[in-house]
Structures are given as C-alpha cells and as structure tokens.
Swiss-Prot record:
Role of this protein: One of several proteins that assist in the late maturation steps of the functional core of the 30S ribosomal subunit. Helps release RbfA from mature subunits. May play a role in the assembly of ribosomal proteins into the subunit. Circularly permuted GTPase that catalyzes slow GTP hydrolysis, GTPase activity is stimulated by the 30S ribosomal subunit.
Enzyme nomenclature, EC number: 3.6.1.-
Main location: cytoplasm
Organism per entry: Streptococcus agalactiae serotype V (strain ATCC BAA-611 / 2603 V/R)
Gene from which this protein is expressed: rsgA
Cofactor(s) the protein needs: Zn(2+)
Protein name as annotated: Small ribosomal subunit biogenesis GTPase RsgA
C-alpha cells in the first residue's frame, strides 16, 4: 500500500491512504540506514488493520525542513505580526531565504493589524515585497483560496498568532494558543507535534514557533540565489561570482544607487553574508586546532 504520513507522535506514524488513516511503525532497518520518516513523506507500507502497520520504504523527497521536521512541502505561510511582537523585516528575510533555498513557495501573512493606528508603514512594506514577487496577505479572505490543493506549512516567530489564525480558518482544530510574555516580548510555545490537517481542499501544518531561525545557506552563491531580486540582477554583473559588496560594475549596487532596489533587503543580505563568512572563519579555526 502507498500513502503519505500525516502525523508523527511517540514513535507512531499515521499514514493516510485513499482517505483512510493507518497507525504504523518504522521497520528496524530504517534506524540501521539512518533514515527517519517525517510528516509529509510518501511511503510504501503494509497493514492488516488501521491500528497496526509497518512502513516498508520512503520515496525520494522534493524538499525538507529541519525545524519543523516536515517534508514535501508546496508552500509556507510566514506569519509576521504588525505589533506585539513588532514587525521584523530581518527575521522575515531569514524565513524567506530558507524557503527560497528549499524551493518552497512563500506566502507572507501579517497578523494583528488591528493594533496599528494606521497601515501606512505596513502598506509600504507590502509594496516592496510584492514588487519582488512575493504574495502578501492581510486577511483570511486573501489567504484561503491559496490553500487549495497544496501542502502548506504555517511558520513564524513565537507569539505572532499561528494557532490563533488556524483556529479561525478551521475552528474544529481547537489548537491551544499562548499569550506574549510581557517581560520578554516572546510567545509561549503551544504546538507540541507536527500534524497535517485537511483544510479548504488542502493540507496544512501548524508547527512549533521560533524565537530565532538558523538557515542552511552556507555560501555567497546560494545566498544570492535566495534573494530573487539579486538573482535577477546578478546576471548583469561583470563578474560571475560577484558578491555585490566591493566588485566593480556590479548591477546590484547600481540598482541600489538608482533606487531600484530596497535598501532594507540589501542590508539584510549583507548581514547574512557577514554571518556566513564569520561561521566559515570559525570553522576554519576549529579545524586548524584539530
């Protein structure tokens, strides 16, 4: 039998096949091979009934996320709050870099707009991201049609309202929500397991919140490719390996000078590039000591 893992909990993998969910375990040979089944995996399995079955093999994955452990994702809704916590373009760009690198379509959703006195600043931010090519949503009405026939992950900084949004989209889920800690400005983690839910003709996953995000991009070329506007401009740079920092005849820097590139995004790119270089130097020092 073939199906997709829709839930993982306490060593059991719940596999959906033809609308029926089977409780399964992974064969011991998976551990020997260092393979771990994840939510989203397409698998071959055997089962005598719905409560006892075994996963026999895992199909090749098209993409994966480490945090949360989920695979074969079509798109990700990155939820950023307008306030409490304040909107953070740097954190948003970290999510976007990860998703671009993983070839997962991002959707930006802004929550808590009612806490703003006006939308002027957020509207300006929205225009910048839309000009890059990102889908940017303010409401459930804008978001819901995008969920059909897709596997969608919901992600974002803790306290931005992921579970609250999902409860509005699908009240039957009754997901626990948490308030912001006044002293830290951080939300409490309220999601304990990764599961798929059938919502609006698609599958969605609510995932553990993040207070920070580590992305897997570890070189300048991949970082450049993960910024769509830089990726497009880099074809016109004089040097193929241009890092858009000091090189002459750099199309990115020229676009920045002409006001055709958003300074905020470029500054975040430079920060991420600096972090990559710092990690590389640290790694070299560790290797040298060995």
């Amino acid at each position: 039998m073939q199906g997709r893992i829709v839930k993982s909990l306490a060593g059991f993998y719940y596999v959906e096949s033809d609308g029926v969910v089977y409780q399964t375990r992974a064969r011991g040979n998976f551990r020997k091979k260092g393979q771990i089944p994840y939510v989203g995996d397409w698998v071959e399995f055997s089962s005598q009934d719905q409560s006892e079955g075994y996963i026999l093999s895992i199909e090749e994955r098209k993409n994966s996320l480490v945090r949360p452990p989920i695979v074969n994702i079509d798109q990700a809704v990155v939820i950023m709050s307008a306030k409490e916590p304040d909107f953070n373009a740097n954190l948003l760009d970290r999510f976007l870099v990860l998703l671009e690198y993983k070839m997962i379509q991002p959707i930006i959703y802004i929550s808590k707009l009612d806490l703003l006195d006006d939308l002027v600043v957020i509207d300006d931010i929205r225009e910048h991201y839309q000009n890059i090519g990102y889908v940017f949503c303010y409401s459930q009405e804008e978001l819901l049609p995008l969920l059909a026939n897709k596997v969608t992950v919901f992600m974002g900084q803790t306290g931005v309202g992921k579970s609250t949004l999902l409860n509005k989209i699908a009240p039957e889920l009754k997901l626990e929500t948490g308030e912001i800690s006044g002293s830290l400005g951080r939300g409490r983690h309220t999601t304990r397991a990764v599961s798929f839910y059938n919502v609006h003709k698609g599958k969605i996953a609510d995932t553990p919140g993040f207070s920070s995000l580590d992305y897997e991009v570890d070189n300048a070329e991949d970082l450049n490719e993960s910024f769509p506007e830089l990726r497009r401009l880099s074809h016109f740079c004089k040097f193929r390996s241009c890092t858009h920092t000091h090189e002459p005849k750099c199309a990115v820097k020229e676009a920045l000078t002409q006001g055709q590139l958003w300074q905020v995004r470029y500054d975040n790119y430079l920060q991420f590039l600096s972090e990559i270089e710092s990690r590389r130097e640290t790694y070299k020092k560790v290797i040298k000591r060995k």
